């Protein structure tokens, strides 16, 4: 359900009126500060509560804002007067010169110079500003260090992963070399076995060949003896 609109009229209840004033006042001052920072505008806000309490905000100094406002209002009434225009720009130059002087003075005080004329409250405010600035510098430095550490961690993880991959490749090459060595050894063993088998078969064949030759040579001697005996038998038969 949408939020209901508040009627723009005086709030009768004093408590509700005070709460609304506090919220709206803080919101207005916050918006004025944001406008001054975002748009580089010179802003001045003056608020008086129903009890007469003063609340104000100025981007530089309230006095310079009021003076500039008065000068601008005076310019509208005499914008066609050349002398008034010259006077206006002279005042603008004086205001800018004053602002530059204030900035230079603040810078020297931030550097720890020209502190002798400051009150305890002013020194406390200066210390608070320095602490805020130092906190911002430390936060930025810590953020940059964290980012650098994250980058280094990512690079370290990549290097570690590359080392793991390289180690796996080395192990794989070693395993392949072992398998190749085993295959070469098997082939050499087969060659040696075949060679031994050939040598053994050669010796057997040579022995068999020698025996065959001996048998062939012995056959004619047997036939010669048989033939001689046959002749002798025929001879004796003839005599008888």
Swiss-Prot record:
Q: How is expression of this protein distributed across tissues?
A: Expressed at high levels in leaves, moderate levels in roots, seedlings and stems, and at low levels in flowers, pollen and siliques. Accumulates in leaf guard cells and trichomes. Also present in epidermal cells of roots. Expressed in mature guard cells.
Question: Any idea where the MADS-box domain is?
Answer: 1-61
List, in alphabetical order, the GO biological process terms annotated in this UniProt record. Answer: flower development; positive regulation of transcription by RNA polymerase II; stomatal lineage progression
Q: Which SUPFAM superfamilies match?
A: SRF-like
Protein transport as UniProt keyword:
no
Subcellular localization, as worded in the UniProt entry: Nucleus
- Keyword Hydrolase listed? The answer is no
Induction comment from the UniProt entry of this chain: Repressed by the micro RNA miR824.
Task: Cite the InterPro entries for this sequence.
Answer: MADS-box/MEF2_TF, MEF2-like_N, TF_Kbox, TF_MADSbox, TF_MADSbox_sf
Cellular component per GO? nucleus
Q: What are the protein's UniProt keywords?
A: Developmental protein, DNA-binding, Flowering, Nucleus, Transcription, Transcription regulation
What name is this protein filed under? Answer: Agamous-like MADS-box protein AGL16
Instruction: List the source organism.
Output: Arabidopsis thaliana
Q: Which gene encodes it?
A: AGL16
């Amino acid at each position: 359900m949408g939020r209901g609109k508040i009627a723009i009229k005086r709030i009768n209840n004093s408590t509700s009126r005070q709460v609304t004033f506090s919220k709206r006042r803080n919101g207005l001052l916050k918006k004025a500060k944001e406008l001054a920072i975002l748009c580089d505008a010179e802003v001045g806000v003056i608020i008086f509560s129903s009890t007469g309490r003063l609340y104000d905000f100025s981007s530089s100094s309230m006095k310079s804002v009021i003076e500039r406002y008065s000068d601008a209002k005076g310019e509208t009434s005499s914008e066609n007067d050349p002398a008034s225009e010259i006077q206006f720009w002279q005042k603008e130059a004086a205001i800018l010169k004053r602002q530059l002087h204030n900035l230079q003075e603040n810078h020297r005080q931030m550097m720890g110079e020209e502190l002798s004329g400051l009150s305890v409250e002013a020194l406390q405010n200066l210390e608070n500003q320095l602490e805020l600035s130092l906190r911002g510098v430390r936060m930025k430095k810590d953020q940059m260090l964290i980012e650098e550490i994250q980058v280094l961690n990512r690079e370290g993880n990549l290097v570690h992963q590359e080392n793991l991959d390289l180690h796996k490749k080395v192990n794989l090459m070693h395993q392949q070399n072992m398998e190749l060595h085993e295959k070469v050894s098997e082939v050499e063993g087969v060659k040696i076995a075949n060679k031994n088998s050939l040598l053994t078969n050669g010796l057997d064949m040579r022995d068999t060949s020698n025996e065959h030759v001996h048998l062939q040579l012995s056959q004619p001697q047997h036939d010669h003896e048989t033939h001689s005996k046959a002749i002798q038998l025929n001879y004796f038969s003839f005599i008888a």
